[in-house]
Amino acid sequence: MAVINPHINFNGNAEEAFTFYRSVLGGEFAKIMRFKDLGSEFPVEEKEAHKIMHIALRIGPNVLIGNDVPESMGRTNENENRSKISVRTESREEADRLFYGLSAGGQIEGPIGDTPWGSYFGCFRDKYGIEWIVEFDPSY
């Protein structure tokens, strides 16, 4: 069976964001690679050499992946809202912990609570501009 792993582009703060995500979601870094580690095959400006070329945070059976986008490739659209990262939890308590932890410093778009479709659900944009859904639904 295929596994879907979200991949997030950042404008230079991928390491900070992933350290924050790990502090809330748990897990371990499976890989951290900086642009300077690529050598001459992929030249970047010195000011961007320390930025993240690839970072992978293993969270249970899932992997959250990200990178910084070098300025030479253009900035990431921080207002893009075509997709969200959805986290399904095993309890209301876990949903609350993740919702309030990840939304700290961000903007809550839909407070967490019971919904007409029977789940415990909330959505927000975190302090890095990434949109999230946290949901507990005992039916799946």
Label each region the model flagged:
Residues 51, 116-119:
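Short, small/polar residue-rich loop motifs at catalytic or cofactor-binding pockets
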Residues 1-110, 123-140:
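Glyoxalase I/VOC metalloenzyme domain signal
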